[in-house]
Structures are given as C-alpha cells and as structure tokens.
UniProtKB/Swiss-Prot annotation:
Pathway stated in the Swiss-Prot or TrEMBL entry: Mycotoxin biosynthesis
Keyword S-adenosyl-L-methionine tagged: yes
Residue positions binding S-adenosyl-L-methionine: G197, F198
Keyword field: Methyltransferase, S-adenosyl-L-methionine, Transferase
E.C. numbers: 2.1.1.-
Keyword Nucleotide-binding attached: no
Protein name, per record: Methyltransferase fsdD
InterPro entries named among the record's database cross-references: SAM-dependent_MTases_sf
Gene3D superfamilies for this protein: Vaccinia Virus protein VP39
Highest taxon, organism lineage: Eukaryota
C-alpha cells in the first residue's frame, strides 16, 4: 500500500512470494493480538456489518475476519488498495476488492458508512501523508462505528539478537528513504484519532513473535520464511535510496538473510505493533 497514483510500485514485487510473506506476517500479528483481528469493541454478532480494510493486498485480512463474524453472509466486506495488481482472479467469497488509495478521495457514498475501518502496516510507505491518511480513513466511519489502525512501533527495547535488530533498522531505513516522518509512532495515532473527536480511544502494544519464539509449532517455520524474505526485499529496496543502506555495509548485507534465518530458527525474536482504535460519537 502507498500513496495514490498509477505509478505506485510495491517494495515487495514478487506476488506469489509476497502473498506467502503476508500470510506469515499476518499469523504472527494475530498471535500477538491474542488470536483476535478486531480489538475495537465492535459487536461482531450483529448482521449487516459494513467493514473496510485499507491496504488490503489480496483481501487476506477480511477473509480471515469472516471467521469472527456471526453472520458474514449478510455483511459488506470491502478491501481497498492503491493498485489491483495483487487482487486474485477470484477474490475470497463475500469480499469485494476495489482499487482505492487510503489517502483518498473516497466515493461520496462511502463517507460515514462503515461500522469498522481497518488498516495495517501502511503508514510507513506514505511519506509525510500519514496523518492525512488517518483523517481520510476516519471520514469513512459512521456515527457509532470504529476505526482500528495497526502499525510498527519502536523495537529497540526488545532483547532481540543482532540479526533481528538489523531487520528493525532496515525497516526504519525504508521508512526514512520513503520520506516517512514516523509521527504515527509513540502515541501519534492515538492523538490524531482523539483530536478529531473520536471517543473511547484505546491502544495496546502487541508483541509479534518470529521463529522459535512462536508458541504454535507450525508458525515457527512460516514466520521464519516470511521475515527472512522481508529482509531480502528490504535490502534491495534500501540500496536504491540516495545514500544506500546506511544501517550496514553492502558486504554485511550479503549474509544477513542467512544469519537472520539461523537466528530465527534457534532464538526467535519479537517486534511490537501498536494497535489503536476509536469510536465516532453517535452525534458527530
């Protein structure tokens, strides 16, 4: 996901491998959130819910969320992404995928029409437009509805091994290279949501497991592969920025993926994601 425009280019271009990476990442984040995808206290037993997922890729989040809905067949599930290149030929049943940037503009009939608006791991790629993006997403929430935002937070406090710490540094370098101001971190998202008049604003810092730290055995290999591929693609992307990698030399980068894979299989690691939610007042 990124800013609007037909010339948007994904950092992770290999669609088949990227979908596998996203599945591993998704599984790790879900465990970190206690096995839940929706932390906002929305009543998922209600029929006819209308839900939007920004930066949806192939709609995997919405497809998994259906399992938490009591009446998914009655719900309107819409995923938007800045380009449709990752949309499958046959979308998940009950999920509609639309080419739509999260920075807007949105169709007028979408405004204040959704019970839940969700977006995950998108703001780092939007340069200095992160606050604008959040404001645009909030405009979709109906009175009494909820927004939920999920983004990486500072991982320096985690007792990770050297390879995982380097992965975190590469993520920060990617954000810097793409012009991100990172103001959404450290309470920024909560402030934006609250300043726009939303109420019942809450947040958690969810620990996302990788490799050997995953409590579910089959996730250890899945997340190891996913984050090793992430490191490989981050190296390629960051080398293209003016100034190059910065956080390591090209020589050090050559063996990082192998070192990371070994470290994840033997030691594992964690990175934190900030989950923020808020409710539009019924009279707003």
């Amino acid at each position: 996901m990124g800013s609007a425009g037909d010339d948007y280019e994904y950092v992770f271009p290999d669609i088949s491998v990227e979908n596998e990476r996203l599945a591993g990442q998704h599984a790790g984040i879900k465990v970190g959130m206690g096995g839940r995808l929706c932390m906002a206290p929305l009543d998922l037993t209600r029929p006819n819910l209308r839900i939007f997922d920004g930066g949806t890729s192939d709609g995997y989040w919405l497809d998994d969320l259906k399992k938490e809905l009591a009446h998914p067949e009655t719900c309107d599930l819409i995923g938007g992404d800045v380009t449709g290149e990752r949309f499958p030929t046959n979308p998940p049943p009950g999920v509609k995928l639309e080419v739509q940037s999260s920075t807007g503009p949105f169709p007028s009939d979408w405004l204040q029409s959704f019970d839940l608006v969700h977006q995950r791991l998108t703001l780092a790629g939007l340069g200095n437009q992160s606050e604008h993006c959040v404001e645009q997403l909030m405009s979709l929430v109906k009175p009494g509805g909820w927004i939920q935002l999920v983004e990486l937070d500072n991982s320096s406090h985690e007792p990770n091994g050297p390879a995982v710490k380097t992965l975190g540094a590469l993520v920060a370098r990617l954000a810097e290279g793409m012009g991100a101001d990172l103001k959404y971190r450290g309470g920024g998202m909560e402030k934006w949501v609250r300043d726009k008049g939303f109420i019942r604003v809450g947040s958690i810092l969810a620990p996302v497991c990788m490799g050997a730290e995953c409590p579910v055995p089959n996730m250890r290999d899945q997340t190891t592969k996913a984050f090793s591929f992430t490191a490989e693609q981050l190296i390629k992307a960051c080398k293209r920025f003016p100034g190059g990698l910065k956080v390591m030399t090209d020589e050090e980068a050559e063996g990082l993926v192998g070192r990371l894979e070994d470290e994840l299989r033997t030691r594992g690691g964690y990175f934190p994601v900030r989950v923020v939610w808020g409710k539009r007042p019924v009279d707003q």
